[in-house]
Amino acid sequence: MRHSPSWSALRARLQHPLIQAPMAGVQDSTLAVAVSRAGALGSLPAAMLDAAALERELHTLQRELGLQGLPYNVNFFCHRPPEVDAQREAAWRQALAPYRTQWGLGSEAAPAPVRQPFQAALADVLAQHPPPVVSFHFGLPSAPLLDRVKGWGSLVMSSATTVEEALWLQAHGADVVIAQGLEAGGHRGHFLRADHDLEGQLPVSALLAQLQAAVSLPIVAAGGLGHASAVSAALQSGAAAVQVGTAFLLCEEARTPAVHRQALMRAAPVCEAVPAEAATAL
């Protein structure tokens, strides 16, 4: 297992080498607080929060965790938002209109929440309440923004789905690499290839082994680790910790909708999941 001074300091504050994956839309600070109080690392997804909402959540985390010396993670995206094509938007709305009428959903779909990349306005808020850990998805922010985050003492983590991405993260200032295997239910974190080809994506066990041979940073295993045996195997294979998301969806502190809770409770213990190009999160 690899260690860095910043990771070793964080690990010493955790009872369990377990990170709750940030899951935008199905959780807020309530779940993060519960996880950190239980001895693992709770995470707050911030990609869908504006500056005011982020400040409220950071106040909660500082009050409920920071003042007690408990660590927590705040997660941001580093993607480039797509440009909206008004004609294509109108075309797909028109194509789906008959189905919305058939199922009594109304004529217009509600606009989806916008996931914003990490930017200066959010960094200004974060600087007032520096979290122990800041994690990123889809790479890292610009060098000036990353320097600000590291300057106030936060440990920086980011996801890699390939060796190439892990090497890039190591070269550009990450303290910890999250090895996101193909089994992961969240957004695919790939960021170096424009085509987002899934053929080169590996299961977490294979990816963990490749990253251990290629980079010197601590590596967190992520993807399909929903059982104690899988967690144990990842740790025995050298992972510094594991990151788990789906397994937390049935917690009472999660905001998982009732229909999704029912589906999870009805699901078979083992089922096949097939990644798709059109959507990268379950």
Please give the residue ranges for each predicted region:
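Conserved active-site-proximal phosphate/metal-binding subdomains
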Residues: 97-99, 187-220, 225-282
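Active-site entrance/lid segments in N-terminal catalytic domains of soluble metabolic enzymes
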Residues: 1-214
